[in-house]
Amino acid sequence: HVFAVTVVGGEPMMRPDVVELFAKEFPKRSCIVTNGNYPLKKFKDLYFYWVSIDGDQKTHDTIRGDGTWAKTRKNVIDYVENNGDKAYKDIWISMTINSRNYKTVRKVIEDWRDYTNKIGVQFHTPFMEGDPLWLPFGKERDAVVDELIDLQKTEYRDYISNPKNQLELMKKNWGGKGTTPIDCPTWAIVSVDHLGREKRPCCIGSAEKDSMKPRCEECGLGCY
């Protein structure tokens, strides 16, 4: 039984025909991860869009390029305003928290709450030691998680989609050694590339034997 299918890129909205195919084959179960730089098309049987946001406008543009935040903002608002009263339910925000944007989490929530249904967060998972984007386990990371939990308890109870228990897990290594998953439930998700080859050890890994692997012991809990 397939609970959900998530289509990632590259950029899936460069191939709306492929997105439409997934929506038809897995009605109300297909999610699309997009940077929002292309117009968001209304697909009848799509579950929802995950729109990647990397901070407030300044931080997002620093990471993704000048003007990208405004372009994504316009495409999201256009979709919501042109597709009926409940169109906002089709849009979820995905924020990958890293060393450059961790101070903007509240601002991201405030910026996007009025136009989207939910936000889901994860932490950047490095592929090498010393990755400058990795926010190390410790005081600053704990503070981010605690802030999210507090926001979830108060005004954003129905907006932050991560359960409290999952947020707590993000404070520490919870199941990996080096690039090897140990307690991670990778069995729950089948990740394949565009050729149908299984990606290992998880969806952010690769099917290529000699490719770099994510550092499981510093996992950002992006999938689970």
Give the label of every model feature segment:
Residues 18, 202-207:
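Residue-level structural signal for beta-strand termini and adjacent loop
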Residues 31, 184, 202-203, 223:
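Generic recognition of cysteine residues
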Residues 47-187, 192-198, 206-211:
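Radical SAM enzyme [4Fe-4S]-AdoMet core and its adjacent flexible, acidic
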Residues 14, 38, 55-57, 204:
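Short, glycine/acidic-enriched loop or turn micro-motifs at the edges of active sites
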Residues 40, 200-201:
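A sequence-level detector of short linear motifs
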Residues 16, 83-84, 223:
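A general structural signal marking secondary-structure boundaries and capping sites
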Residues 1-45:
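Conserved alpha-helical substructure of the radical SAM core
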